[in-house]
């Protein structure tokens, strides 16, 4: 049954104060909360606050703690001079674990600090750092995920200096292993029974029993993400029991207990497919009670998974373990996010509450009656909220109060139908201080990445391609949610398989036409932009119409065949593009779906932005497109950001992107 209780209030706003100008610095130098977690006793919430401005313009972070009921103001536990993240509570609620790169920049180690502050205690000095960790319920052990330490660092440096640093593909590839750290002795024991599998997640059974471990065959995303397996590990003996393969993009293993049986649920792509919506899949481990691990031993024969979300018109985004009850989950629901709890009797999720915009980072008390999470609405940036499940929640953090004096563009929710009748949604941000009746305006269409992603009714201000950044400069901004994205169930998402640039393109164009017909958009001043898959769509659009007067292609794909062969998500990219180059001489589906194939038809000026060290969408995609545009004499600007990956981290580069995109539109619109 649908429940429309609002967890986080959002009042409609049409006017704003105008005492402050939105600068690129105010966008980039923002503090953002991350990773809230409720203490075992249910009284406190710990979280990290990350901000730019560290050494080299890279982010730094600090650990904060606040009362769940908001009775006392949050306080900072660490000084924030390093990158301190990922807080997790000790079993007695007396201290907080976290990761810190204080000793070596970009090398995370495990640390601990008392809830009342004081000096933080370093717990590891693992060469190469740790990838993740999980404090166990015995209070004496921490499960740590880390690569092997390897040989002497000076020997490695010597080999590099002599040129003896060759890389043989697939040989000696580092994998993250499961290790158990004894907090008293500081001894580390590696669980050898997992072999050379790459461990990506671990969750302990709430009664202090075995660990659920999710692993890949290799640390490489391709084929790692397609070769996930679940295991159950006894932390005492180190014994490993195999539960077998799980689906594409498997994540978030959680335990729950019902009727004498332990269940182990996780999230993966629905129906065993490569492309589609995520689903919650559940298995029963046969045992008479919670006290032993023979459940996993019996499960070695065969494990069956039941799809608990089959037929739901929403998409799970987070699945959260509750110590004394069934799991909670967040679901993307169109432009909103809803909170659900699993009903143990029906094995279906019951909707508890809904909030406009985005909810994330869900954490729950032992009973599941209290929760904390991150929430962002149309005019409020992401902050930590806490309170009873179902709401109302109290805002604990307030990381960007200065933004309340900025005049924002009014953000409207849109709903319309595609040319084939498919219901669609999206957002429109009007120019700051302007109303619909003052149009038409120059319109920038910003396409989201993924494609399995969405725009929600949240605060749209980020360093890459920001809706409100453009709205404060006088542009209307259209944020479409075309088919292939999340928030509308599995079938909606699965339409992208082998068909990128098809239905999603006509969905976007239909929204643009609607805004022109309504008098909002000026048909002579249209632009399109996006990052990642959005960058692909921008490149695709200008190869199929001359209606756009400017385009921005950020970290976008120009050639799906090349992307399948060189991108780190190759197996998924091959499914999106529809084929690979090694399937024969062609013709290939991926050529039909690639913007590079239509470069001769492009007349629109293009700004190409790309990180030099991008492994998700390698730089070659941008170079390929740049050379094609140069060949055909198309006006364009090609910008490469040194040291950057798929998302830009350095402050100077983020500032450049914001200013350069605005300048590009000012020039052409």
Where are these regions (language model features)?
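A flexible loop/linker signature enriched in serine peptidases of the S9 family
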Residues: 49-62, 78-84, 99-111, 119, ...
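Cap/lid segment of the alpha/beta-hydrolase catalytic domain
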Residues: 399-524, 531, 565-569
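Active-site-proximal cap/loop segments of hydrolase catalytic domains
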Residues: 469, 479-669
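Beta-strand-rich domains and repeat architectures in extracellular enzymes and scaffolds
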Residues: 25-61, 198-203
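Short loop/turn segments that connect beta-strands within beta-propeller blades
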Residues: 67-71, 114-118, 182-186, 234-238, ...
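Hydrophobic beta-strand positions that form the internal "hydrophobic ladder"
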Residues: 42-45, 96-97, 142-143, 211-212, ...
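Residue-level detector of Asp-centered blade-edge/turn motifs that repeat once per structural unit
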Residues: 40-41, 91-92, 137-138, 206-207, ...
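Non-catalytic accessory segments flanking enzyme active sites
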Residues: 34-37, 145, 152-154, 171-178, ...
